[in-house]
């Protein structure tokens, strides 16, 4: 699919500052888009925030999280048919991040990406899990024998992935990881996404996120 760029002629002054704040990473807005056939850059008018996002703007940890997830969404979401379920999930997740205490956001990106898989059609077959099985990242299923390719998790990693399938925005703060383990989990998730979407290895915000969490 092709990418669509939105240009906002905000100008300068107080109104420009307000508009730029609305259009921050993961900003949820209602607007009028001037979409014209044959153009790759489209105009944007009358942006209006659908709910307050002051915490997302003001908290550096949440802001870094938002920048990373916005970059991921820019790669996996392409022009196509409207998907109300996906929209409601993303909006609900952003609202949850906005309302969440800052000290509880460390696992948000892990939870978001795992649950996003369902709406992208790449959700692992969690029902196929069994003790001693390994997770085949290409077929998105658990199996007893190693596949011919190298994209699979060890039995211990596979068990850990299954345990993560129970994570949601309400209980994710109960999953206690140190920075090294959290980065290993994120690396595995990004490897999984990379098998289904190109460009995941070059995310600019990934290293920044790893330094914070």
Q: What does each model-found stretch correspond to?
A:
Residues 2, 7-213:
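Non-catalytic alpha-helical scaffolds and adjoining flexible linkers that form interface surfaces
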